[in-house]
Amino acid sequence: MDTVRVAFLLVLVLAVSLGQADKDENRMEMQEKTEQGKSYLDFAENLLLQKLEELEAKLLEEDSEESRNSRQKRCIGEGVPCDENDPRCCSGLVCLKPTLHGIWYKSYYCYKK
């Protein structure tokens, strides 16, 4: 019986000591993986930030182009006063001095060609 007890105690001590070593080893592996994961997350975060900045720059550029285009589309309709030096009449209209009924206004108006 004593040999069985001694053998059992020996196996128990070996299992506990090896198990403890495995636990420490597992803890070290987990720490390494966590550190690698953090560096990977930092890299992914920086990459995403760069892509977002590029996208934002493109959107701002498109907005400024749209603003320029919308300013070009603005025009003055028919029968509306216009400036002789800077006519902004819509296409198909010309900035002319009014005849007869509008002479007293001393202004130019957009009329059909």
From Swiss-Prot:
One matching Pfam family: Toxin_22
Signal peptide feature range: 1-21
Tissue: Expressed by the venom gland.
InterPro entries the UniProt entry points to: Toxin_22
Cellular component per GO, a single term: extracellular region
Record has RNA-binding as a keyword: no
GO molecular function, one term: toxin activity
Residues making up the propeptide: 22-74
Disulfide links within the chain: C75-C90, C82-C95, C89-C110
Major site of localization recorded for this protein: secreted
Keyword Signal part of the UniProt annotation: yes
Subcellular location: Secreted
Keywords from the named record: Disulfide bond, Ion channel impairing toxin, Knottin, Secreted, Signal, Toxin
Compositional bias (Basic and acidic residues): 60-69
Location of region: Disordered: 60-83
Function: Probable ion channel inhibitor.
Domain notes: The presence of a 'disulfide through disulfide knot' structurally defines this protein as a knottin.
Protein family according to the UniProt entry: Belongs to the neurotoxin 14 (magi-1) family. 01 (HNTX-16) subfamily.
Name of the protein in its database record: U11-theraphotoxin-Hhn1a
Organism of derivation: Cyriopagopus hainanus
